[in-house]
Amino acid sequence: MKFAVIVFPGSNCDVDMFHAIKDELGEEVDYVWHDTENLDGYDAILLPGGFSYGDYLRCGAISRFANAMKAVQKAAEQGKPILGVCNGFQILVESGLLPGALMRNENLKFMCRTVQLRVENNETMFTSQYEKDEVINIPIAHGEGNYYCDEETLKQLEENNQIAFRYVENPNGSVSDIAGIVNEKGNVLGMMPHPERAVDELLGGAEGLKVFQSILKQWRETYVVNA
């Protein structure tokens, strides 16, 4: 399986994402610059955290216009797994690939610590290796991670089982304790916590690795078993 890590000016978690795939998952991965127009050679696309384009205007607001995002849109339409973490989640929302918005944290402070997440839906291509309602420890590092959507959108997210992760103790004011959501099709996941920073016990825990293992399992079942 071959992954692409999209690198924007200001990305700073791309190396962590690359390490998670190459060294921990053991799969092929490339850094792909934001001006690429073709992602056809990749099986999964990863949008890392950071401060793309300095987070001017709004987090992710400029990145949505990058050439690579047109290719990401195409990959999403093809059903390829798209994972956006932290700033990557913000970019997915700004691009319209996921509903809602990310606002300033409720306390107006940047937060950097490990939090507990509850797996709300373990039937997605990103969460199949977890147990339903499993509680996992994953780091956060954001100033604008307060997820917001209107009541109608929240109702749709809940009815369609699109809420992948919730905070056990809400750190930022996110509506309904939401930490991560998938699109209706189930192949695009956005989450504020950083699973790529929790893939090695030496780094404090490996509970984030199952996100990437789930993607790999889905790909093998779809393309290797059926080959």
Swiss-Prot record:
Transmembrane segments: none annotated. Gene3D superfamilies: 3.40.50.880. Its EC number is 6.3.5.3, 3.5.1.2. SMART domains: GATase_5. GO terms for biological process: 'de novo' IMP biosynthetic process. Pathway: Purine metabolism; IMP biosynthesis via de novo pathway; 5-amino-1-(5-phospho-D-ribosyl)imidazole from N(2)-formyl-N(1)-(5-phospho-D-ribosyl)glycinamide: step 1/2. GO terms for cellular component: cytoplasm. Residues 3-225 form the Glutamine amidotransferase type-1 domain. The keyword Heme does not apply. CDD domains: GATase1_FGAR_AT. Part of the FGAM synthase complex composed of 1 PurL, 1 PurQ and 2 PurS subunits. NCBIfam families: FGAM_synth_I (TIGR01737), PRK03619.1 (NF002957). This is Phosphoribosylformylglycinamidine synthase subunit PurQ. The gene is purQ.
